[in-house]
Design a protein with these regions (language model features):
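Conserved active-site and SAM-binding loop architecture
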Residues: 1-359
Length: 359
């Protein structure tokens, strides 16, 4: 965007992604595959916003799994090609989304971020390099992970006890066990005093600790009530847990405490419905590359969710932003305004169809 084309008026930016519930391949019943139905009506609100708001720049996002017929019609309506970007390039999550925008930008370079890089606990491990796509459903189960290849779980080596104190060097784990533990002798840190192998108590297998059931990995196989599964983990004892809200935020490249104003359940949901921030930032950098950081920007955000668009502009350093958002989920709005009180909440996106609508 060339700033001289604006003649001193604020730059107008339209962003949004209509809810993908009706189009996603994850929709088991009554999935919409043609450019009609409620899913298409939600998209039409974005089209109406584009017509009435008359933005200088616009960015639209949705799930890659939408049918080709729907994607083709979106391209026809918006007049620009779609670009598929996998969030795995800039995060630890596999998340395929398509974007349509009225400027060009290349794919992001692969930053080499792995799932293990975003875990809160250093002793936690994962067997895959990238997480499955974050979804809105917070009830993630071991069965979903192993049998459906959905959700994401984390393996924590079982902590057996302490030797002498609770300091990090004296904790006993079955980290890379092969039926043994590492323990630290007294007199200082394990690195200084030496480590000794002791037999791993077999009676711990199949017991339940304070964090859940204990699983034994042997020969890269983990037995569960759903069957035996191959895992890329060293032999040893593990408990299985889901990602924390902080880890889920990191998958979406959002700040650790961004969801602090709502429950964990709503935190997972809001993040699952949201954007991968660094993917949006990468694209906006090209659209706004010639715009000074203090230049006035008027944003219209459709289906705003947790305010990721506002966060992106803030992280990019833009300081003169008017941000109006259409959203109806009260928890998402709570998160958005907790982080950015300047977001102006406008309510239901269908209000844009009113004859007297104005920004």
């Amino acid at each position: 965007m060339n700033i001289t084309e604006l003649n001193g008026r604020p730059l107008r930016l339209l962003i949004g992604g209509s809810p993908c519930t009706y189009w996603s391949i994850a929709q088991k019943n009554n999935r919409e595959t043609e450019a009609e139905g409620l899913g298409w009506e939600l998209f039409k609100n974005y089209l109406i916003a584009k017509e009435k708001f008359n933005p200088d720049l616009f960015l639209y996002e949705n799930n890659k799994s939408a049918s080709q017929a729907i994607k083709d019609q979106i391209v026809h309506e918006l007049g620009y090609p779609l670009q598929v970007i996998d969030s795995a390039l800039v995060s630890a999550q596999k998340r395929l989304r398509f974007y349509v925008k009225n400027w060009e930008c290349p794919l992001p370079e692969d930053r080499g971020i792995l799932l293990k890089d975003i875990l809160e606990l250093s002793e936690s491990v994962v067997e895959k390099e990238k997480a499955y796509c974050l979804c809105t459903d917070h009830v993630w189960t071991t069965r979903d992970y192993f049998k459906k290849h959905q959700s994401q779980i984390v393996f924590e080596p079982v902590r057996i006890g302490d030797i002498g104190s609770n300091s990090q060097a004296h904790r006993v784990y079955s980290c890379y066990g092969k039926s043994v533990n590492l323990v630290a002798n007294g007199g200082g840190q394990g690195a200084k005093t030496g480590l000794y192998f002791v037999p791993l108590p077999e009676e711990l297998e199949k017991l339940v600790c304070d964090k859940g059931k204990i699983y034994k990995v042997e020969n890269h196989t983990i037995p569960t009530k759903f069957g035996d599964f191959n895992v890329n983990l060293p032999d040893g004892l593990y408990i299985i847990r889901k990602l924390t809200v902080t880890e889920a935020a990191r998958l979406q490249t959002m700040p650790d405490n961004y969801m602090k104003s709502v429950s964990a359940q709503q935190g997972y949901k809001g993040l699952g419905n949201g954007w991968t921030a660094e993917v949006i930032i990468h694209q906006l950098k090209y659209g706004l590359k010639d715009i000074p950081k203090d230049y006035p920007i008027e944003v219209l955000s459709m289906y705003d969710g947790i305010g990721t668009g506002r966060y992106c502009l803030d992280k990019m350093g833009y300081t003169n932003v008017t941000y109006k958002a259409y959203e109806i989920d009260k928890y998402a709005m709570t998160v958005a305004n907790d982080n950015y009180p300047d977001i102006i909440q406008c309510g239901d996106a269908f209000q844009l169809r009113e004859d007297d609508w104005a920004y």
